[in-house]
Amino acid sequence: TVEALLAQKESRFYEALLPLGVYTAAYLNAVEGANYDVAKLLDWVFDGCKSPAGRTGWGIIVGKWGDYDVSGLQGSITDGGGYAFLMNSIKPAWPFIPMVKYQPQYAKAIGKWMLNNASACRLFYPGEIDETHQWAPELKDITYDNVSYEGLRKTDDYGKASLKGVSPVAIGDGPKWIKGNPTESMFSVYSSSPVGILGAIVCQTNVEGILRLDCNVTDFYTEKPYPVYLYYNPHKETQTITYQATQPCDLFDIVAKEYIAKNIKTNGSVEIPANDARVIVELPAGTELELKDGKIIANKQNIISYN
């Protein structure tokens, strides 16, 4: 439960449970009027676990390894200077992206993290990182670039001579699991299988560096009457994206609490402020909104903004 998480004196972050707890707390705050400390739970994720009684050193990685930006990946911050895992890097997107519908004040932070994370997740795939930075490039063709390496280490921990001084290294623990496990076991079906989460959420826009993130597709247990998308602009200037509508629509931003376009027929232009985010709800054109008890309600029945 959320109470069990918040009863901890410090972070116990490992893999997926704490990010799911963040979503649960945000949802219950919005929908049920709870008052859980979402900020504390988010800090526990991004600052990582420092307790010797937990998975010490587990967190969200920030920075560059060699020439590669690995910010946003999840794994050990301390093991050999850093050891990220693809499965763990993908999984937080599942709860974090829909979470911003309920706590839009975190849209910018989550949008920035997701942009970095989605970019860095490519580095686990043998067709997306150069051969000098992977442990078994001679075997990459067996993956068809659909199966990734399990992990990405800051430095090789097997002692392979050709990887001395190389950072990062796409790698896997398979050969360590049992004596005789082949090098091929560095490629990981369990790590690659959740990539559909990213495939469902992430879509490019006409502006490089700005992604359209679907806030509904992994929000599994709620009514979703309208499309909702998170856009984060990492640039120093306002950028104009092309919004592709599914119907004649009005666009309402629940971060700024304002309409940003009305009566779009097919494609429209939307401005995303510099270094900021929008969470855009696509409403059927002419939908009436009302403010009641701090909530914005569409057509007298669907809450689109909770605070």
Language model regions located:
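Well-ordered alpha-helical segments within folded domains of soluble proteins
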Residues: 1, 14-28, 80-99, 194-196, ...
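Solvent-exposed beta-hairpin/edge-strand motifs
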Residues: 246-259
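Carbohydrate-binding/catalytic loop surfaces
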Residues: 3, 19-36, 46, 59-84, ...
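Carbohydrate-binding surface patches
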Residues: 166, 171-247
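C-terminal capping/lid segments that line or modulate ligand- or cofactor-binding pockets
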Residues: 89-100, 104, 136-203
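C-terminal beta-strand-rich structural cap/linker in extracellular carbohydrate-active enzymes
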Residues: 264-306
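Membrane-proximal bilayer-interacting regions
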Residues: 74-135
